[in-house]
Amino acid sequence: PEYRPTVIDTAVLARRLVRDEVPNCKLSTLASRLRLDHSPTHRALDDALATTDLLHVLIERASGFGVLGLDDLVTLSKLAGHPQAAKLTMTTLLPRTPGVYMFCGGRDEVLYVGKASNLRQRVRSYFGGEDRRRIATMLREARQVRHFELPDPLTAEIVEGRLIARMLPRYNRAGKRADKYCYVRLDAAAPWPRLAVVKEPSPSGLHLGPLPSRTMAGLVIEAFHSALPLRRCSTRLGAGYQPPPGASPCSSAQLGASQCPCAGLADAAGYARAVDTARRAFQGDPTAIVERLSARMGELACAQRFEEAALARDRLSALLGAVRRDRLLAAVRRAGRCEVRRGEVAWTFDAGRLVDVSVAGTAGRALPADPPPPPADGRPVGRALVDEALCVAKYLDRNAGQLEVVSCSGVWDFPVAADDALPRLV
């Protein structure tokens, strides 16, 4: 294997740690001013010995910034110049293990919650390459860092989501993102069904979601409309609807892109076939729509209409992503209560909720945040539960080949089958 040693640049470290004590950071100047045991003579051995002496001095100085290991020293060149570098002492007691960290303000309020595979390394990184404006403001307010040490990154991600949902920290945008969740709904039982964006699923109708934004839901609907002549108007059409005399068709119908039953210009049999194709996509089989959209995308690309082809690609990507999320959530719910093991860590899930985690040789441990409650009978699934179930489902799907299923009360469907079109189109 290729030899790739860890590199420590003593010149950069010296500029960060002793720049105010010396006129320049030449090795000869540093050796003289810091009274090193060896002086450089432009000969390999003497210069190497002087550099080693300098490194020992810099390591001693670096300890004042909370440097306790090689990884800390490697990143110090970035950290020491940060406006809030003095607060690096808040990271001194953080372990190099998975967990959840919380930046807290002067009144002990939680400002920001995050997860990490290596708590110490992740928290210290905020004082280096992090350039988001809101994080800079948060660091100015932070007075301490609290943490929960957890057995693995999956548990850390789940606990992070629970804490954000419970505390709604000011600097966590993820905590506010759930309010934007929405669904695409098809009321297939209604006369002349149409697609709509709704905030919550209802007992009747078919739904795709939850989707992260109305923009994404709009792209999904556009994907259906690009492939199927479903009506786009919002007119309520009951079983006995009669179009008013002289009603004019909507613009999409005039262009031949959709049927228009509200103006009496629709073929019931053809419309029923389009609804049946849409229903199959909602139930997890978007093959017909994928084929039509991919063919349309190819035609546009061949005609050098690349912007329109890119829009068709985005619509198709949104549709496949929505179907994929739906499949993952359905799979984790079908699994019921199951115990899964990877290495020394074992998790117990109940319909996508993490209810217990243990490490080999130890009893199950209480988590810092309780799981979201299961949905009441007949009520839509809560957003916190959806987030956690989706997190679990993605992990099980991604790592299915490395997991040992100890028990499962339902049906184990991981890895979830992907559409053949997904790898080449998304």
Language-model features and meaning:
Residues 9-11, 32, 291, 295:
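Short, conserved phosphate-binding/catalytic loop or strand-edge motifs used
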Residues 5, 46, 306-310:
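Short, solvent-exposed positions on alpha-helices
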Residues 1, 16, 20-78:
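Acidic, Mg2+-coordinating catalytic module of metal-dependent nucleases/exonucleases
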Residues 2-3, 38-40, 171, 232:
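Residue-level detector of short coil/turn "hinge" positions at structural boundaries
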Residues 11, 28-29, 222:
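Short glycine-/small-residue-rich flexible loop motifs, especially phosphate/cofactor-binding loops
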Residues 84, 91-426:
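Conserved catalytic/ligand-binding micro-motifs in nucleotide and anionic cofactor chemistry
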Residues 1-17, 154, 164:
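Conserved DEDDh/DEDDy metal-dependent 3′-5′ exonuclease domain
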